[in-house]
Design a protein with these regions (language model features):
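N-terminal capping segment at the start of a domain
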Residues: 2-40
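Zn-dependent metallopeptidase/amidohydrolase metal-coordination segment
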Residues: 16-29, 86-87, 353-404
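A non-catalytic alpha/beta surface segment that caps or lines the substrate-entry region
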Residues: 28-74
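A short beta-alpha structural unit
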Residues: 36-38, 268-277, 289-295, 321-340, ...
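Catalytic-core environment of secreted peptidases
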Residues: 57, 69-102, 107, 231
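A generic, well-ordered mixed alpha/beta core segment in the N-terminal half of proteins
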Residues: 93-164
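Midchain, well-structured core segments that form catalytic/ion-binding scaffolds
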Residues: 133, 137-298
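His/Asp/Glu-rich mid-to-C-terminal helical/loop segments that flank catalytic regions of hydrolases
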Residues: 231, 235-261, 306-309, 379-407
Length: 407
């Protein structure tokens, strides 16, 4: 195509919606969300459907040792490094139907549009579905893109277990997605990840397209408290070593941390287990998680230092022992400025109001960015809601983002 009409091409918005709805039917929940935990039977069905669509497009389909699915469309100069885009099909428990899936199926629609209009690209174009982005079944998140980028070890990843002790590597084998191709990076000219914002800013400011300049740092910790279980009736309040009460105080310290430290810091306790979890037994053991995020790596580290000291002091005061593990840490990712600007300029050319911003959520682009120039394309989340069943994005915004990706 000539430069003068390069922006005339458009994706088929109705077809994109149809694809999203078909995938959303896999693992659909009663309240309108989805539950497709990584490597579950539901995730497998979504993968199978994606592969069938890629094969219909006559793409070169490859599955690597971490179950990442790649579909490659040849370019006129096929030895050049490809442009790659994608996201993930796994979900949170009772999660939303747009998170991740929009990025995979948005790129699928781009591939279909290129075929429909017989567009020949100079470079090859690759679509990818990353395994276990969410980390809700196998912790940590983004583990497969991390292995692909060389940041995480393959054997270590295979050894990650879910709550029932099932290992990630065994599940890959069970569902037939432990591929023969090595899970390692290959030359990529540019990577674009299309995603819902998962926050309120675009909607609040009346923008259709977001162009993140990067992704905040993410730090995950696991806190294990051990007190003394006992019968609730005969045991006096004085002298109890209640692990759950200690955890409750600690959780309030986590909530107070951002107010104390300032900046853009956020801190969350999202998971907790109480043992023996009986109404007439004083809790003896508690495990909970801490998630700390900030655009400033140093602020997040300093915040953890402050919090850790407080947690240790609280445990001692409550007569409980405590063990703390740092289970995952990813530094701030700053995207390629030229690619970020390209997203903004393309949105402007398509008459979509846009905004340069920061991503507060983690994405596979964080690891891919360590290997090749990367950027993301955001569209608004209605009410800023995500990782929940009521997660929604307007269909016209889904189409708008896919058109930015196309160009």
């Amino acid at each position: 195509m000539e430069d003068t009409d390069r922006y005339d091409l458009r994706v088929n918005g109705g077809r994109l919606q149809e694809s999203l709805e078909k995938v959303a039917n896999i693992g659909a929940t009663p309240a309108g969300g989805v539950q497709r935990l990584a490597l579950s039977d539901e995730d497998t069905r979504a993968r199978d459907l994606l592969v069938s669509w890629l094969e219909q497009l006559e793409l070169e389909v490859t599955v690597d040792a971490m179950g990442n699915i790649f579909g490659r469309r040849a370019g006129c100069e096929d030895d050049l490094a490809p442009v790659m885009s994608g996201s993930h099909l796994d979900s949170q428990p009772r999660g939303g139907r747009f998170d991740g899936a929009l990025g995979v199926l948005g790129m699928l629609e781009v591939m279909r549009t290129l075929r429909d209009h017989e567009v020949e690209t100079r470079r090859p174009v690759v679509i990818v579905d990353w395994t276990n982005e969410e980390g809700s079944r196998f912790s940590p998140a983004m583990v497969a893109s991390g292995v692909w980028a060389g940041a995480l070890d393959l054997r270590w990843a295979y050894d990650r277990s879910d709550i029932d002790g099932v290992k990630l590597g065994a599940e890959l084998e069970r569902i037939g997605y432990r591929g023969d191709a090595p899970c390692q990076s290959f030359p990529v000219h540019a990577y674009y990840e299309y995603h819902i914002e998962q926050g309120p800013r675009l909607e609040r400011e009346g923008k259709v397209i977001g162009a993140p300049q990067g992704i905040v740092c993410l730090q995950w910790y696991d806190v294990y408290l051990k007190g003394e279980a006992n019968q609730v009736g005969p045991t006096p309040m004085e002298g109890r070593h209640d692990a759950l009460c200690a955890a409750a105080e600690m959780i309030l310290e986590v909530e107070a941390l951002p107010r104390e430290m300032g900046g853009d810091l956020v801190a969350t306790v999202g998971e907790i287990q109480n043992q023996p979890n009986s109404r007439n037994i004083i809790p003896g053991e508690v495990h909970f998680t801490v998630d700390i995020r900030s655009w400033e790596d140093d602020l997040a580290r300093r915040a953890w230092g402050v919090l850790e000291r407080e947690l240790l002091a609280l445990a001692e005061r409550r007569g409980c022992s405590v063990e703390i593990e740092e289970t995952w840490s990813v530094a701030r990712s700053s995207f390629d400025p030229k690619l970020v600007q390209r997203v903004l300029e393309t949105a402007d050319a398509l008459d979509h109001p846009s905004l340069k911003m920061v991503s507060g959520a983690g994405h596979d682009a964080s690891y891919v960015n360590q290997v090749c120039p990367s950027a993301m394309i955001f569209v608004p989340s209605i009410g800023g809601r995500s990782h929940v069943e009521v997660e929604q994005t307007r269909w016209q915004d889904c189409e708008a983002g896919a058109n930015v990706l196309l160009h």
